[in-house]
Amino acid sequence: MPRAIWKGWLAVGQVSCAVALHAAASTSDRVSFHTVNRKTGNRVRREFVDAVSGKPVPREDQVKGYEVAPDEFVQIDPDEIAATIPDSDKCLRIDAFVPCREVDGAYFDKPYYLTPAGDAALEAFALIREGMRARKAAALARTVLFRRLRTVMVRPHGAGLIAHTLNFDYEVRSSAEAFSEIPKLKVKGEMLELAKHIIGTKAGTFDPTAFDDRYDAALAELVKAKLEGRKPKRKAAPKKAREPSDLMAALRESVAATERPRRRKAG
């Protein structure tokens, strides 16, 4: 089992159990690069310099600064920042249970796996998990994680639980603002029926293994080609999408395209 990044308690009312939090997503397997000197091949290091004098600034003289006006900063010392970190009792205290579908995906931040920490926690952990599963509910809990008070949505996931940290309301931009210039159009009749038919023929199941990271694969191929002293394979230019001049004709052609494979199979 991967190392836990946080350990504490999961509590609902007077029922509690020791739990461990594990990262559910990681970018460590992606191709990554260092910055090197083209002439020597040596790695280069980053150095902080004064923006005005151009002189290097020693680490002990570097402090955080909040900009209150152009190039005017209020300096904040590390111990002053540390004093603002909320006190933690290491407890994911459940405040409420809500239907899983009620939390808008725009509020999801990062996913974590939640597991029982030790044999003594197994029974209470299973009780909380199965209770939520039976009610098709998710728990909303709050605790201090990574120096911030976070709201976390917890729900059953296989033999364990999955916990999503949630974005604060002020961090999520209003959809009304993003969609403000979209006119209200009512689609009906044959056009809507054709669209529904196309969607029906494309129905499937979510399989994350079917979605490959083409950029990372291309980077890996580039590195391999460099090591082998050959030119990397040239990628084919993607087919450009364009708006159809006749939407109804495009819908009918799409329906016909889905029907052709069926006819070949039937024949």
From Swiss-Prot:
Residues 11-195 form the Ku domain. Keywords: DNA damage, DNA recombination, DNA repair, DNA-binding. CDD domains: KU_like. GO terms for biological process: DNA recombination; double-strand break repair via nonhomologous end joining. It comes from the Bacteria. InterPro entries: Ku70/Ku80_beta-barrel_dom, Prok_Ku, SPOC-like_C_dom_sf. Gene3D superfamilies: 2.40.290.10. GO terms for molecular function: double-stranded DNA binding. Residues 229-267 are annotated as: Disordered. Homodimer. Interacts with LigD. NCBIfam families: Ku_bact. With LigD forms a non-homologous end joining (NHEJ) DNA repair enzyme, which repairs dsDNA breaks with reduced fidelity. Binds linear dsDNA with 5'- and 3'- overhangs but not closed circular dsDNA nor ssDNA. Recruits and stimulates the ligase activity of LigD. Belongs to the prokaryotic Ku family. PANTHER family: NON-HOMOLOGOUS END JOINING PROTEIN KU. This is Non-homologous end joining protein Ku. It comes from Cereibacter sphaeroides (strain KD131 / KCTC 12085) (Rhodobacter sphaeroides).
